[in-house]
Amino acid sequence: MNLSFAKGGLPAPVKNRAWQYCQMAWRGVTSKKALSRLAALSPLLLLGVGQMASATDLLAGGKDDVKATFGADSFVMMCIIIAELIVGVAMYIRTKNLLILLGLVVVIVFTTVGLTFIK
């Protein structure tokens, strides 16, 4: 019974066996036969790239739905503005600071302008 252990805790022959398998796999990939097959198939792979690039846009029909949901005149925009108003008024009542109401106007303008870019 061989109980000699290497540093990692596994027997030395197990580590060597794994390394030998890696070396055999690398030799198989880099052999002249494998490289010649790769050289013969690479032009065929390049011919197929043009066929894969042509496709139909499956999400083109959803563009109108996105505009209706997140556009400038949408229901989501109305909900965002109402939420901003509620939070702004609550913050003003809590702090009694008029600059918060000015900030509320600025935030509403920025969100309105930002959501108009959704085309």
Curated annotation (Swiss-Prot):
Membrane association type: Multi-pass membrane protein
Residue numbers of N-acetylthreonine PTMs: 56
InterPro entries tied to this protein: TraA
Acetylation is among the record's keywords: yes
All ranges on the Cytoplasmic side of the membrane: 91-97
Transmembrane segments: 70-90, 98-119
Primary location recorded for the protein, binned into one broad class: membrane
Disulfide pairings: none
Subunit structure, interactors included: Monomer. Interacts with itself to form filaments; also interacts with TraQ.
NCBIfam families linked: TraA_TIGR
Protein family membership: Belongs to the TraA family.
Chain's role: Propilin is the precursor of the pilus subunit, pilin, that forms conjugative pili, the filamentous surface appendages required for cell-to-cell contact during the earlier stages of bacterial conjugation, and that retract after contact is established. Mature pilin is assembled with the help of TraQ and TraX.
Name listed for the protein in its UniProt record: Pilin
